[in-house]
């Protein structure tokens, strides 16, 4: 009997059944979906959680626009390991392990195996939630052409695809060479082209009023408008279309918006970003002789994506930090010289706010002259794997080398150079009254005064001077080497012992380098330095399958399974993963399986080495405030030992005292932590497989029922600032004191001992967990004149929780859509039906997403009882019809979202909202009914 290798084990066995829960999507499933990207199909599977990055949620990301990732069990993309032919694939996200599915040619895939549950012992780090193993086609002979075109009912979201796959096999059938070329194009979907998102809006929900959650306040325009908003001492004003001064009226007349002076950002935003892809792939198997051979896999993917959001919103505090006073005049040789570009109306209504002898003002303005903020991303991924495999004295062996590289070049427009803008804002009249920049050196460098007052007031020369094009260059490199052997050791009465063992080496490097202005925080944003890092790991593993009993009453077969992997990381040192399980075949029709596993995830490069990026937190409470010099508790002692606190106490009668400026003067940095340890996950799965061959009607049916539970107690999270403060001073935990920097002495109006920096860094202080049941059922057979196949997959989620810190209460997310964009319905299901009758074929896919409540923490903050505000369930139906013109030619027509089911109104301000879409586009279809037609030709 031929033995096969299935995801979840490295030991080939006669039965293609995994010891852990496994679901398989075939190439026929991919073809019936009409999907141009694998994520579109995978997200229909109920084991999948909310992806961190997709085409419909990445418009506002600073990088990774158009990337598509997967997230098993809602435990995070970084805890789902994506493999290609059982081997790792280079990441598509800098500093992370998440694979961009755009880089894998959909039409070159034979099947996708979804293994849920911890699998780090078998495959290494990151497989805490499970594994997505993408198996490419092999031994294909001939030519296959597939082309399609389609668009949405609204005339957008157009897509085009052409894919050519070819293969040739040697005369003896032992060697094969395959190639693939693919091109796909998916168009943009603009927020303004869907009624629900055409206007800026926000939820009307407020304290104690749950009934207002899905009532939209429209319009809810931005206070940063293209004509500017200017603040005097007692009023604020703006300009009309003719640049006449008028009062500010942000949203206009209630209900109609008439006379609004605010800005509608939805005119510029996208629901889905456009993505173009070119894909090249090749595989080959060359048999030296019947026992030994070589193989190779090559992939090159080039993708182009573009995000688009509203023009830059500039506030005077972006230019003059921290308070934002803009000088309306200059002191030159002791004389006050007015800026000639400042209107008299404003000049007459301002005073000296900061005591420097110069009148100043404040403003907000939308820099519409700059155009929209647009990021164009070109991403190239290359991967080559090669190796030897064969059989030696009854044992199978394989060795391989893999090299992968992802390069992303991003260029951005619409940003402003803060230093240039500051020079341009500080204008004085020259000898003939013409406005010039005050700073002589700036004038020599081409400074042009800028006028912000009114529509289109910025001249092309001024625009050129203050514009700051942005860039980001990221490079990810992966190198792998490994070898393994597998075979059988005879000797037990119940059969031979299956054994597999191997060694692996891996190197990961990543860098993300923004432009110099972004690094320095001089483009009106926070400083974002480069992030670079690398690590290597050496691993050994061993797996065994031991037959315990065979051909006994109620025991057709009983086997024990065990796997152990030891890793040695250059960053975290030694790691150990293991799993142990039982497979009990009671009868030919009934089988039980159970697995207990410990999986590890080493910290990724971002978590270890993210460079400090500046932030300005609000709402922090200093535990030391009010502590006295005579206090004897741990808090008092810890506070007095902090720099500057004793000085502060001495100046305030022995009590540590802070003022408002101290609270507003806190800055901080978000950074990685090179001292992180690997996180450990424990998983349990217990399952039942039933194939009721004795029942005539069900003899071709397969049923599986699997219970799963996963818990991570030392998860890597970015520690909350308030938690770090409390741990340092209240809990006497010095590890967290390193995140806090105090002023040793008073600086201006900032007190001695006040917090200067409160940082966020990654720590092993979090926790995650999930628990539930998976059910699958499948059947195929003759029905009427044709053949029918049916498959159902359902997941019931009992529990999903996260814990910010070890002593914090668990935040239960099952059945909720949360503030951190996790959508976790208790029930999700997918039903696939396919019928074939002669040359005619039809397939139907129904995807059900159960109801969810709004995040209980969000509702509690509004004094609303948890569970009282819910989003209803949604069912999406996709169909495809095929007609075989002849044996080699097939036409097909498909409709996605057949009944045009609308997404729920998850309005801005509610948890789960994706900016610019007024719903959760990671979960629900925000585009609507879509059509496509295609042609397949095989030769």
Annotate each predicted stretch with a short phrase.
Residues 14, 43-88:
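Extracytoplasmic beta-strand/coil segments of soluble accessory domains associated
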Residues 798, 847-858, 882-939:
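C-terminal beta-signal and adjacent terminal beta-strands/loops
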Residues 87-116:
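Short acidic/polar hinge/loop motifs at secondary-structure boundaries
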Residues 615, 786, 790-884, 899:
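C-terminal beta-barrel architecture of Gram-negative outer-membrane proteins
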Residues 139-142, 171-174, 289-292, 391-397, ...:
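Short loop/turn motifs that connect adjacent beta-strands in outer-membrane beta-barrel proteins
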Residues 38-41, 68-71, 100-102, 126-147, ...:
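N-terminal periplasmic accessory domains that precede
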